[in-house]
Amino acid sequence: MRRSHLLATVACATLACAPLAANAQFAPAGSGGSPTSSVPGPGNGSGNSFEPTENTPAAKSRFSGPSPYAPQAPGVNAANLPDIGSMDPNDVPQMAPQQSASPASGDWAAYGHDDSQMRYSPLSEITPQNADQLKVAFVYHTGSYPRPGQTNKWAAETTPIKVGDGLYMCSAQNDIMKLDPATGKEIWRHNINEKYEAIPYTAACKGVTYFTSSQVPEGQPCHNRILEGTLDMRLIAVDAATGNLCEGFGNGGQVNLMQGLGESVPGFVSMTTPPPVVNGVVVVNHEVLDGQRRWAPSGVIRGYDAESGKFLWAWDVNRPNDHSQPTGNNHYSRGTPNSWAAMTGDNALGLVYVPTGNSASDYYSALRSPEENKVSSAVVALDVKTGSPRWVFQTVHKDVWDYDIGSQATLMDMPGQDGQPVPALIMPTKRGQTFVLDRRDGKPILPVEERPAPSPGVIPGDPRSPTQPWSTGMPALRVPDLKETDMWGMSPIDQLFCRIKFRRANYTGEFTPPSVDKPWIEYPGYNGGSDWGSVSYDPQSGILIANWNITPMYDQLVTRKKADELGLMPIDDPNYKPGGGGAEGNGAMDGTPYGIVVTPFWDQYTGMMCNRPPYGMITAIDMEHGQKVLWQHPLGTARANGPWGLPTGLPWEIGTPNNGGSVVTAGGVVFIAAATDNQIRAIDEHTGKVVWSAVLPGGGQANPMTYEANGHQYVAIMAGGHHFMMTPVSDQLVVYALPDHKG
Amino acid sequence: MPNTYGSRTLTEWLTLVLGVVIILVGLFFVIAGADLAMLGGSVYYVICGIPLVAGGVFMLMGRTLGAFLYLGALAYTWVWSLWEVGFSPVDLLPRDFGPTLLGILVALTIPVLRRMETRRTLRGTV
């Protein structure tokens, strides 16, 4: 220990201090004096004065983005929309009863089925006994896939919704369509002509939102609307019956969400999740491309009137008391934590639960404000009347591991001490820690312990938190910390290679501090634990279904000089060439002393993970009787995976990495694809037995859904594939039903 | 019929190739295994590498001892891997599957090596 600590200190002194000094212009205003060799630590800053002002000299590194005060690049306002006006949140009209509040039994009215986002359907035609007879009923092609000359950045991740006579969905590039739920016939399609350049890390559209207006009478256009947030940052409202833009919403049916975000380029900021509507307020979040620069566009959360599209409020972390839109050359404070997961609305409490990510430059935290440190990698309950947080529950303190929350919160009732149900919220995390909170005040219902974590770490001026929260009342969706003997391979040769790789890295468990002198192992990595697939919950049986990953990462901070040599530059650098791909988060972190290199913890010569299988699991937890694991097994076979990317064809349930969630039904069947074996499965909810599986035309990295049409149950999965999961991309929505109900 | 003067049969050539493969694996074990041991990791590889290199060299020399050195290293590998991970098939796979396959091939060379040894002895006495 002593020796390695000494080495780390020496390495930091020689490698790190020069760039630290070069970035001293970001010292808090008024701190005065000559540049110092350390950056301000937590609590040393004075809030938003960290952000460069208009007069701050340009950064001196070889690659860097323009001043945050530079104008937005052409195409950032994709539809050249005029600015949207504001209105008083108190003037938002009373919301009409929504389909998502109490869907018809055969409908799937919201991304996670209904307002609770339980991913539970009361349908029961398909059972563990008959599921093995499921056949393809129809296939629908969205038409969105990489064309020749385009880098594969596709992963549609789409879950359709079903309301009444329509199956509503979006393509990976945000075209909106309504299908006949029984036949898959296209009833209408609204093309939004999104440009390839607008695709950020991934072309994804997780879904659309169904909204019923209280202002437009029934029977008139746009009484029922489909709302969508797009990759190119538009909020779009179309008529559910015709697909025509709702003229009364925003500017001719669209709102430019880049308004107020300041300098940006296409692909830097994007929306991939369906925006929830809470008491008439449509709330939007957006992802900000990881790893680019400290002063990336803001992660601001905004509320708009779902009827008119007018701006209501903003929650801008570093302007906590200012909920208005910036005017003139001003912008929302930059580099603040973004939220890219699906949010959950709560009409009864007037809250929206925002799963937050990290401040920009995920792996270096010394330039974050105290306000940011309070709300990053947290669940933030925003009051939809004001845009102010009512409570915050943080799942990682001072996150430098990209443990941002990708999952959507699920609402359910927990039995209270006096027998009264407590309104609860289940928040799965990439850490595999699942937090169960009282949604009235954010207090844990199941015990949460603050446990010691490695601190202060090795990066000067950027100490780690001495403790981190652990949800000790819930089974952890992770395996124990890695050991050398967990290294795997085809033979002792690659196993030896991985053992050396393991020993050459810093590793002191889940919160191993980032290092620049040598790599560090990050487990669970940014792929989870539980990622955007979230969990499903059966309120009848009290069973929670969670799928999760065991995919460690191998990361290293690099000095600015090394980052320049590697050609790491922010997306808004004039030299930036789009195309990239690869692991998420590799980046320049321009504006900080370091860049970041992120790789899977794998044998780069065989493409096999270094750790032993399984790499993906599925777990059923009994929430009503002491949160015990009912069953747990690896998810995904080796059929489409193997060394050098070759499919082995083996039916061995090795447990593959998985992305995408599950559905649980009253029939006692869990439907899930997610695994990289490109199969969809039906699993007996009570035993965990796989009762049916079918091979998809592409990777099933999406949340499935189920609905009823013409009196019969259907199961839909977008087989869109995933570029980083290396599964085949397709544009096919595949819908299954029992025989004799083919479309 | 065993040939008498120098030219080798196919099985003898294959035995020599196997010897070269075992030397290469053994060298990797010794060099990378020493690295691992110095990093604080398992010493199995560097220890196992020595009989592997020696076994490969003896096989190239046409000595039956080479095959037995390999089989001895294989026995050590099984004992070590069972000690390290127990009877877990997933974990035994990388540790023992390849070496055992190679061990079967090595066992098949024993008659060939014996023949080469006998021939050398005969040549020596003529």
Curated annotation (Swiss-Prot), chain B:
Catalytic activity: glycerol + A = dihydroxyacetone + AH2
Source superkingdom: Bacteria
Record's subcellular location: Cell membrane
Topology versus the membrane: Multi-pass membrane protein
Spans traversing the lipid bilayer: 13-33, 41-61, 67-87, 92-112
Keywords, comma-separated and alphabetical: Cell membrane, Membrane, Oxidoreductase, Transmembrane, Transmembrane helix
Cellular-component GO terms for this entry: plasma membrane
Keyword Nucleotide-binding: no
Catalytic class of the enzyme: oxidoreductase
UniProt EC number: 1.1.99.22
Coiled-coil residues: none
A GO MF label: glycerol dehydrogenase (acceptor) activity
Record bears the keyword Hydrolase: no
Disulfide bridge map: none
Protein function: Catalyzes the oxidation of glycerol to glycerone. Also acts, more slowly, on a number of other polyols including D-sorbitol, D-arabinitol, D-mannitol, meso-erythritol, adonitol and propylene glycol.
Descriptive protein name: Glycerol dehydrogenase small subunit
Source organism per UniProt: Gluconobacter oxydans (strain 621H)
Species classification: Bacteria, Pseudomonadati, Pseudomonadota, Alphaproteobacteria, Acetobacterales
